């Protein structure tokens, strides 16, 4: 379907104007805002999509480790959750990069984009809290982030250090949240859709609400413009669920397809293959509603 206004306006403004014509409003959800923040730091959605399939992206998964602290990995409680912080050697040992030189290049790029922060594991002489302290906050003294005490940078403040403290790395909280909530799947689906396309752009995590409503009617994981076609995508770690839950999920994606006049609806999963029951349920409901959009199922999204 030709959409000259989409080419002129850009994808998000076009989606918003199309939603208004359907008496709805479209905005980035909180996950979408986080994805936008990271994409801006990297130089755009295309760069973000490439990150998740690169050695750098695979290396970042080490920060999601939930095992107790060991070796060069320290797990600390921060805010309401436990988070892992890693040394250079610990990142090298997890094997996403072939050698130390490649890892150094990856770390340099991620530090330049501020997705990683370099610092020290230090404890507080007053409250004894062990904390990650960014390198720019450390001089002859450093403040405790918990109690505010000013500590001297001396040997008794170093956590697990030998003769000198090691550098540790911290992952940006937005990227931690994206990985924890499977936000990489929309990027991986975007990569699949972008293959062999002459023109491709996309948005992640857009929510639609009726005018005046307090909460969204539905949220779309991915909206893409591919070689003139409007594509909406739904991403899952597993299947679509069952019973009424599955029917409601499918119905809302079909609502979005009708609102945006989508040419294609794509369901993606991290599972090795889509259950036949899910495929049948989608096609049956789409047929009953007269949906003309092409419907596709893509599995094994993390295989690349």
List where the protein language model places each region.
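Intrinsically disordered, low-complexity Ser/Thr/Pro/Gly-rich regulatory segments
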Residues: 1-304
